[in-house]
Swiss-Prot record:
GO terms assigned for molecular function: rRNA binding; structural constituent of ribosome
Gene Ontology CC terms: chloroplast; small ribosomal subunit
Entry similarity comment: Belongs to the universal ribosomal protein uS14 family.
Protein name in UniProt: Small ribosomal subunit protein uS14c
InterPro entries recorded: Ribosomal_uS14, Ribosomal_uS14_bac/plastid, Ribosomal_uS14_CS
Length: 100
């Protein structure tokens, strides 16, 4: 189980990313439209004004049961070992066991 502070930090980053998403997207579109270099630099300065944690690159996928940041399966939102345990106990319908 991940520490609760790390999970809360991740939630805060996700909220910030949603809050500043439109600002980032609009400024990136403006950079593509503008041809003069000085205007591009000015718009790029606006792009740097939102907080760092609002950047989508700083988000991590976490297992929604344990909060584990590694070995996540995107389709299920679970880490690999939790997914395997749930398949073995027949908690995920339609998933088949693999024998290693």
């Amino acid at each position: 189980m991940a520490r609760k502070s790390l999970i809360q930090r991740e939630k805060k980053r996700r909220n910030l990313e949603q809050k500043y998403h439109l600002i980032r997207r609009s400024s990136k579109q403006e950079i593509r439209k503008v041809t003069s270099l000085s205007d591009k630099w000015e718009i790029h300065g606006k792009l740097q004004s939102p907080p760092r944690n609002s950047a989508p690159a700083r988000l991590h996928r976490r297992c929604f049961l344990t909060g584990r940041p590694r070995a996540n399966i995107r389709d299920f939102g679970l880490s690999g070992h939790i997914l395997r345990e749930m398949v073995h106990t027949c908690l995920l319908p339609g998933a088949t066991r693999s024998s290693w």
